[in-house]
Amino acid sequence: MAVGKNKGLSKGGKKGVKKKIVDPFTRKDWYDVKAPSMFSKRQVGTTLVNRTQGTKIASEGLKGRVFEVSLADLQADTDAERSFRKFRLIAEDVQGRNVLCNFHGMDLTTDKLRWMVKKWQTLIEANIDVKTTDGYVLRVFCIGFTNKDSLSQRKTCYAQHTQVRAIRKKMCEIITRDVTNSELREVVNKLIPDSIAKDIEKACHGIYPLRDVCIRKVKVLKRPRFEISKLMELHGEGGGGKREAGDKSERPEGYEPPVQESV
């Protein structure tokens, strides 16, 4: 009989002994996701990340994460009918246990888009790239449908090609006017009640009556250089009450600082 080591036993240890299972959640921490101050509900939810370990910093792993939230969860209960509108928020900075997010895009749910499309009408779409006053480049998509006139006896309500081109041109003009003269905060405030789409519907009524006009999607193509002060202002935590350098503090005449009893 050959004498030697049993390689199988030396590598694996004792036969039948199971490895200790470590719960991966013990190495993770929970962080609160905060939406910008444009929305009435700031607490969006929570997210997990591995704890800081060596050169791997937890906050760096959170930056750049994108959260998709329904508008009904971001606004008051009375706005529940707007649940088909989804906002995308991107994590830009971490303050303590709070992840501060910024606007990253907007979209409609698939079921809402499918519900709007009907027979015997013309679908009109337009998209345009616009730049806000604070340096964000957005691609805005708009959609609308021709509406049957109440006095018309026809079953269909198809628009002519010239009318479609005129409506598409009007859509681009109104989107450009409303976005280029506004900051990102003001653009988001217009997207929440969809006021841009209402302006388009009124302006295009003279060309052809429209229904279900809405901003279908918004993409953020380019962002300005990141500044923590602007992000804090967006979250309503900016130093609006900060004293500018060189300002004199108001003190009564003959003011003397109090004497300290101990140092």
UniProtKB/Swiss-Prot annotation:
It is found in: Cytoplasm. Pfam families: Ribosomal_S3Ae. It comes from the Eukaryota. Residues 235-263 are annotated as: Disordered. The keyword Metal-binding does not apply. One of its GO terms (biological process) is translation. PROSITE patterns: RIBOSOMAL_S3AE. GO terms for cellular component: cytosolic small ribosomal subunit. HAMAP family: Ribosomal_eS1_euk (MF_03122). PANTHER family: 40S RIBOSOMAL PROTEIN S3A. Belongs to the eukaryotic ribosomal protein eS1 family. Component of the small ribosomal subunit. Mature ribosomes consist of a small (40S) and a large (60S) subunit. The 40S subunit contains about 33 different proteins and 1 molecule of RNA (18S). The 60S subunit contains about 49 different proteins and 3 molecules of RNA (28S, 5.8S and 5S). This is Small ribosomal subunit protein eS1. The lineage of its organism: Eukaryota, Metazoa, Ecdysozoa, Arthropoda, Hexapoda.
